[in-house]
Amino acid sequence: MIREPFRYRETFAAILADTPAHADAAKRGMIAARQVLECYIARDPFFASTFFPYEPETDETLICHMANAAAHAGVGPMATVAGAIAAAGINAMMDAGATFGVIDNGGDIALVSDRDVRVGVHAGSAPVSDRIAFIVPPQEQHSYGICTSSATVGPSISFGMADAVTIFARDPLDADAWATAVCNRIRPDDHRVLETIDPSRVDGVYAIMGESVVSWGKVPPVVPARVDEQLIAAGDRL
């Protein structure tokens, strides 16, 4: 297995692949997706700035997919951008014949895998941060999403207070959108946002808020781990 950093404009990702050819396919897929997105935003800047669901005036598949996933979660379409770019890379890897690939796009992960994958959890100053991992079972049929949103870690805009909200979903864009939505609204004493989740779109939720941990739906096994924060894909490390 190889691990390659990838940087293109605002995308800072890490690619895990079995072969250099599969990693190269991932890079091409992510670049192509970014180019489609940038071309559309040039025509419709509001798509990039709104925090609310938005119906784009286009039939471009990527743009419509982003808007649809965001609308179901009640957030703006750019809440799905990291998941969308990562998913594009994984889909390109699969088209190139890959049965294993992981793309970490700043804490938002898309993967396809014929084996178990261990995904560590970084949650800022929370007690469990860097001490646990999920054992994600094989996901061989399509790209799978494991996306994390945080109000205390990283540069992304958040209206919440959670140290980490991780969403597991069969579509990385759904995972990304719902990570934002849940992180914005969940509180240690208020979990009502979980009642709004469509279980046909989201498999599970794992939310960390200081010493409080909330789990919903089908979450992969959680095991003790020693997580190296430096392995998280971020702009200051690539």
UniProtKB/Swiss-Prot annotation:
Source superkingdom: Archaea
NCBIfam families in the record: PRK04334.1-4
Recorded family membership: Belongs to the UPF0280 family.
HAMAP family named among the record's database cross-references: UPF0280
Protein name: UPF0280 protein Mboo_1274
Species name: Methanoregula boonei (strain DSM 21154 / JCM 14090 / 6A8)
Source organism phylogeny: Archaea, Methanobacteriati, Methanobacteriota, Stenosarchaea group, Methanomicrobia
